[in-house]
Amino acid sequence: SEHVHQTRVAIRRLRSALRVFGDWSTDVDPDWQEQLTTLFRELGSTRDRDALSEGLLPQLQQAGAPFVQLPDAPEENSIPIEESLRSLDSINLILALLQFVHQPSKDQKKSGLKKDIAKKLQKLHQQICKDADHFLELDIESQHRTRKRVKRLRYCIEFIASLYPGKELKNYLKDLKPAQESLGQFNDLNVAEAMFQDLVKRKQKVWFILGWIANEKKYILEQAQAHLDTYAKTDTFW
């Protein structure tokens, strides 16, 4: 499943680049976002299950859970992964992206490149700082949005890292990373909770797991809030 995971990460990174920097070229096809999203979903969530098996299950075992096993995976996708990647739509998308990368650009970015980068990064930075002000009061969807913003910002910084002094950039990422990790852990717990809620009617022992997850979510949420508070005070490098 590692190659599938890496493909999904690559798609996430590309979607972030197109979303934030896509206006730099008139050759960017606006349909690519939707096509990449479709392909991402078709690749399924096997990696989510692997991550839970490696991280959550040992914790449950250590906590003395009477039942330590992930629920069976739902039939979420009737299209095999290799078939999805070999489909005409996927091949056309890959060819279009390759053509975009290798063809000479008609658009020559003007001298205000760093100014434009700063504007884009500042927008994401401010959105995350605004969320940090009241993160614990946000609903689940808004907290999920914060997680995606943090991840998108990190990807964007990695894309333009060579243009900025290393020390300031590293310090910024150092304060961003803990927030990303705690938000990722919170998301994993939400995924696990949804999995086990479907099973609890058939297996009463699962109540222990749901109780443990609920308690862990409270702890991770407070940790995420603390990490976001620290991040909100960090100096920007742009």
Each language-model region and where it sits:
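Function-determining surface determinants
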Residues: 1-238
